[in-house]
Amino acid sequence: MPTAAAAATASLRVSNIPPSAVAAELLAFFDSAVAVAGGAFACEIAAAHRGWLSRGHGTVQFGSAAAAAAAAGLASSGRLPRFLGALLSVSPSPVDLLPRASDLSLRAAGAGLVVGDRVAERVFEAADAWDGVRAEVIPGKRRVDLYLEHDSQRYKLEVLFEDMKDCLGCTLDGMGAILLQLNYAPRIHTAISGPAVNSRFMDDRFHACKEDAKFSWVRALDFTPNYSFGRCSTLVLKLGKSALVSDILKSLPFSGNLGELTMNSMDGVGASSNVVPLVHCPRDYSVPYEVLFRLNSLMHMGKIVAKHVNADLFKALQELPVDVSRRIFEKMHKLESTCYGPLQFIQQEAYSMKRSHNVLLSNEGEGEGERKLMKCYRVNITPSKIFCFGPEEEVTNYVVKHHSAYASDFVRVTFVDEDWSKLSSNAISARIEQGFFSKPFKTGLYYRILSILKKGFSIGPKNFEFLAFSASQLRGNSVWMFASNASLNAGGIRRWMGHFENIRSVSKCAARMGQLFSSSRQTFEVLRWDVEVIPDIEITTDGSKYIFSDGIGKISLRFAKRVAHHVGLDPTNLPSAFQIRYGGYKGVIAIDPMSSIDLSLRPSMKKFESESRMLNITSWSKSQPCYVNREIISLLSTLGIRDEIFVAMQQDEMRETEEMLTNKEVALSVLGKLGGSETKTAVKMLLQGYEPSSEPYLSMILKAHQENRLTDIRTRCKIHVPKGRVLIGCLDETGVLEYGQVYIRITKNSKEQKDSNQSYFYNDDGKTATVVGKVAITKNPCLHPGDIRVLEAIYDPDLVGMVDCLVFPQRGERPHPNECSGGDLDGDLYFITWDDKLIPEKVDTPMDYTATRPRIMDHVVTLEEIQKHFVDYMINDSLGAISTAHLIHADRSPLKARSPECLQLATLHSMAVDFAKTGAPAEMPRTLRPREYPDFMERWEKPMYISNGVLGKLYRSAMGHMEKSGDSGALSSSSAQPSPTYDPDLEVPGSDEFLQAAEEYYELYEEKLTTLMNYYRAELEDEILTGNIRNKMLYLKRDNKRYFEMKDRIVAAVDALHREARGWLLSSRKEEDASRMASAWYRVTYHPDRRRGKRFWSFPWIACDNLLAIKASSQLRRRRQKDDDSTAVVQMDCSA
C-alpha cells in the first residue's frame, strides 16, 4: 500500500473547450481569471493525431496548488467566466504537465549550490560551486530539482528523497543553507533544443507555456572538469533567507540542525579518469589488493572520506595482517555515520584485537565447500560513480575455477543508474527528434558504457579489461572483466574457452562466449574416446525444420553414478538427467542404462569448438513444487478456467500458511515446498518433536517463511498447485510415445505418500508414481493462449527409470516443447498440472516461434562489435515492459489474452526473448503502452484503475484476508524477539568445561553475522538467514531479478559462515567432545543466566544434528526411566 497520500498537484483537467480555441488563449483566460499568486503557468489541449483537431479537453497547470484550488473554486461556485462563449468544466489532474513545486514556498531562485565532501562534523570542503541556481522541492515526486547553467549549457539535477543520507539545516557565512549528504550522485540532465527537437511545448495551437519549454531534457554525465559529482557525496544549497530554509526543510526528510558550517576549498588535483571515486596506494607503501578494494568500498558506502585516506592510513594498514584489516573494515561497515578519524579507528581496533585471541579463530573452518563457492568481487558503475562490493560468496563457474590462481583478477561489473536501479533505455538513447526518419539521440551514458567496455578501468595496480558476459548477465546489464598479468590476459582466456571464429553472428558469438560462465560444479575431464556424437531427430513441417532432440543427449549409468557422487548426491538415488556444459556443448544428458559410452551428445548441443574436456554440472532433475503466477492464471482464465477456482486455491493456500505456526504437519508440508539449509534444520526439529511455536529459532524461521509466502501471494499471485510439479524436459529415446502423449513419473512428497485416494497415480511403489490422464503443460514466460498445451500422460514400462522429468515424444508434426513458449530440451523447466479444475476443455493453436535469422557478418566478429551489441541490448531490452503491458491489456479486454493487443505483444515478447541471439530488437508501439495500471500491480506513482479481472479479484481477496487476520503484509511478531523456553534436555554432562570457549565462539559468530546483516541491510536475524529482506532498497523493489540474485548471495554467505562455524565445533577436538561443545553453544545462547539483550538463536542450531541427537537421547532416557518406574510400581503392587 502507498505510505502516504500523494501531494496535490497544481493542475486541473478542463473540458468543454471550444474546438476553435488555441492553448495561448486558454492560458491567458485562466491567468486573468485567477487572482492568486502564480496564476496560470502552462496549458495543453488534447488533439486527435488525424486531422490535428481539438478533442475539446485539456490540462491547465497553475503556478501553485493554491492558484489551481482558486480556479476550481470559481468553477464549482459558477463564478468562472465563460471562455469564448463556453462554460468550462474543471476537475483535479493527478499529474502536472511540467514537474514543478506546487507550493511557492518550496521554490528558491538565485540560490547557490556547492558540491564537495563533509570532512568533519561541521567542516565542508568545496570542489565546485554555482550561483543563480533554481531549486524546486516536489513532495509529490519525493525529489528536489536543481536548475543551473555551466559553460552556457543548461542542466537539471534530480535528488530523490530516498537518496539523502542526511538532510541538515545550517548557516554558512551567516546565510541560511541546507546540507544534503547523499548515498548516490544526483541524476544529471541537460537541455537539448533545436528545430528538429520534439519538445512537448513547441510553438503550436495546442501548447502554451509562460517559460521557455521548447527543449527536451536528456540524461547527461558529470559535466564538471574534475568529475566533482562523482568524486564527492555532499551538496550544500545556499538559500539566504532563514524563513525559506525552514519552509523547504519541512518538506524534506529532515535530520536536524548542524549550526555554523565551515567551508574550505578542496585540495589536490582532479581525477585522471572518469571512473571515480577511487583511491590508490601511494608508491612508498604496499597493501594487498583485497585491502585496497575493501577500503574503496568503505569510501563508496560513505563510511570514510577520500581526504582521510592518506599515506599514514596506508602505513598503518601495511603493518596489519589481511584478516585483521578485514575484520576492522567489517566493523567500520557497521557504523551508522561517517567515520572522520579512520586512522585512529583502525589503530584502536588493531590494538584491541591484538589483546584478544578471537582473531585467531576467524579462519578456522574456512575452505570447506570451496569446490562449489568462490569469492567474487563486484562493481557497480553508474553514470557518475563506481561502487565496489565484496568479495562475496557465489557459486563458482568453470572459467574462474580453472583460473583460480588469478581469482582476484576477475570482477563482475554491472552498469546501473545512480541509485543502482536498472538503467532505462531512454537514459542511454533518447528519442528527441520528430519526423519519420528521425534517429535516436545517443546520450553521454551510451558512450561512457561503451568506453569502459573498450578501455577498461583500474583499481590500484589492476587494469581491468572486458572479458565476456553470460546470457543472464546480458539481461542484468553485467559483464565479466579481467585484470591481465604477465601470465594471463583476457584474450588468452577467451582462446582457452573455445574457437569462436566461425560464428559470424555478433549476437550468437557473444552468447557462446558466455556459455562457460554459468554457475556450475566441475566433475571430471571426459576424454574424446569416451564421447560419441549421435544424430538429432528432425522433421520438416510446412517448410519449417523442427528438432525433437534439440539440446538433449545421454549419459551411461556407470558414469552417472560417478558424477552424482562427485557433486554430493546419493548414488543410490540417482537423478535421471543432468544439465551440463562440456567444452562447446550445452544441454541435458539423460541416463541410458544400456549405454557403455560415458557421454552421447548431439549436434544440436554443440554451440562452438573447444579443447576443454571438463564436464560441468549446472543442475539436475529433481521434483520441484508447482505454482501458478499472474501469467499462467491470465492464460488459464482466457481458456475458460473460472475465477472462483483460483480464489478457492488462494484461500486454501492462505489458510495453510496461517496454520503453519500451530500445526506441525502443516508446517512440515509448507517447508517441504521450500529450499535452503535453514528449512532443513527446521524440518529436522519438527520431526524430532518440537512444536512450531515452542522453540525461538524454529518459531522465527516459520514466521519469516509465513510472511514471505503471504507477500508472494499478494504481490505475485504465487499460489501452490498440489497436483502439479515443475520438471525438466527430456526426450523419449525409446520412441514409444505418440504425438500428444507424455510420460511423467514423480517422487511423491510426504502428503502424497499418506494419501491413498489418488486415481491419477499408477504403478505406485510408495516413493514414486507415474501420472496418468490429462495434464496441462506450459513454460514460463508464457503470453500466448496457445502456450498452454493439454496432453495425455501415459504409463510405459520402458520409461519407468525416468523419474522427476517430463518425457516428450520424438514424433509428430512439431515438438511439444516448441509449442510451449518456444521451449526446447536444453534445460528448460516445464509447469505440469494434473488437477482437473485447471485443465482447459479446449486449447488454442500454438504460436509460431520460428526466430528471426541473425545478421551474418562477412568477417570474423570483433570484440568491439560484441561490446556494441551489449550496449544495444541495454537500449532495446523491452521484455519487462512487454510483459507488463500484456498483463494489463489481458486484464482490461473482454477477450483477455486473445485480444489483438495481447497477441501482438506475445509476438513482440518472442522477438525480445530471441534478441540476445538474433540481434533483432522488438520495439513496442506507443499505442500498446499502458496509460493506467491495475490496483494489483501496486504502482502507486502511476494513474490507477480497479481491476475487475481475476488478478484484481485475487489481489483484493488476499488484502481482505490479511486485514481480517490483522496482517497487512508484514507480521509485527517477526520483529520481536521470541520469548525463549530453556530446554534442559539439551544439557549433557561435561559441557561446563566448554562454556568459556562457547561464549567466545558465540561472540565471533555474532560479529560475523552482524557484519553480513549490515552489509545486506538486514535488520533482523531471520532476514539474513532466509534472504528475505523486508525493507529492500528501492532498486531491489523495482527489479525482482536482481533481488533474487542478491538473495542467492545472502544464502551463500550464510551457508559459508555456518560451514566455518561447524569447523569451530570440530577443530582440534575429539569427535566425542562435539556433543558437549554443541550443548555449551546452546547454553550460552539460551540459558537465562547468560542471555544479555538480543540473542542470535541460530548459533547453536548450526550443530543441529548434535543437539537433536542429545534431545533424542534425553527423551529415550526419560522413557526408560518412566518404564522402569512403572515396572517398579507393578512389582510393589504384586508383592503387596
Swiss-Prot record:
It catalyses: RNA(n) + a ribonucleoside 5'-triphosphate = RNA(n+1) + diphosphate. GO terms for molecular function: RNA binding; RNA-directed RNA polymerase activity. Its EC number is 2.7.7.48. Pfam families: PH_RDR2, RdRP. One of its GO terms (biological process) is siRNA processing. One of its GO terms (cellular component) is nuclear RNA-directed RNA polymerase complex. It is an enzyme of class 2 (transferase). Residues 967-980 have a biased composition (Low complexity). This is Probable RNA-dependent RNA polymerase 2. It comes from Oryza sativa subsp. japonica.
